[in-house]
Amino acid sequence: MASNVTNKMDPHSVNSRVFIGNLNTLVVKKSDVEAIFSKYGKIAGCSVHKGFAFVQYDKEKNARAAVAGEDGRMIASQVAVINLAAEPKVNRGNAGVKRSAAEMYGSSFDLDYGFQRDYYDGMYSFPARVPPPPPIALAVVPSKRQRISGNTSRRGKSGFNSKSGKRGSSKSGKLKGDDLQAIKQELTQIKQKVDSLLENLEKIEKEQSKQEVEVKNAKSEEEQSSSSMKKDETHVKMESEGGAEDSAEEGDPLDDDDNEDQGDNQLHLIKNNEKDAEEGEDNRDSTNGQDDS
């Protein structure tokens, strides 16, 4: 396993360093890069970053051989951009402008991985991931023109127009026939559903009307029973009042007879008392006469 150091700034290291761009680093790992580039010579260092990688060889000739052999290779479904780090490929926007290694790296600046990443992101324009496939264009069916009825003699070639018209009409007739059949089937299904719904509604209405009639009958029966009960109660009250009056009328003559009997008894007692008084006076008179004699 090679080291991760690929940022040495001495001229020998810079000239023997290979840059791999447009690399799908989500799939390709450090071991994969080493396996691909180790066949060109001994690898002193290898570093993998987001979207690109560096391979540091011991010799410049090995680096140039790797660039010549691997540039444009398909790695993980992406075309890799491979060149020497000291001789980067000029971007299309900067065509014709050459930049030296001193301008790119600096003479006395110690590069780190962050600087390398920012620098090469600006130097090379490549996607970090596999670009999405272009959308599949759906087949567009051209709309058919309606056939204009009229005199065919006005057109150029009547025979050719009639044949093409027949072909177009036959195709459109087939399409229309299929469409009509499908529409008819859908309409029949809809009609069946509507009929079933109407039947259910009629059943519900009939049940509701029956329930209403039953409720009305029950109410009328209750009213009749309550009215009959009231009539019976009034009749009973009237009978009870009439009986009381009759008993009162019957009781009056008895009271009169009792009163008459009591009067007769009193008169009889008075008469007896008078008789007793008279007899007592007579006895007194007789006793007085005897005494005088």
UniProtKB/Swiss-Prot annotation:
Pfam families: RRM_1. Its main location: nucleus. Residues 242-263 have a biased composition (Acidic residues). Residues 177-225 form a coiled coil. Transmembrane segments: none annotated. SUPFAM superfamilies: RNA-binding domain, RBD (SSF54928). Residues 16-87 form the RRM domain. It is found in: Nucleus. GO terms for molecular function: identical protein binding; RNA binding. Keywords: Coiled coil, Nucleus, Ribonucleoprotein, RNA-binding. GO terms for cellular component: nucleus; ribonucleoprotein complex. Residues 140-177, 206-293 are annotated as: Disordered. Residues 206-222, 229-240 have a biased composition (Basic and acidic residues). May play a role in nucleosome assembly by neutralizing basic proteins such as A and B core hnRNPs. Belongs to the RRM HNRPC family. RALY subfamily. This is Heterogeneous nuclear ribonucleoprotein C-like 2. It comes from Homo sapiens (Human). The gene is HNRNPCL2.
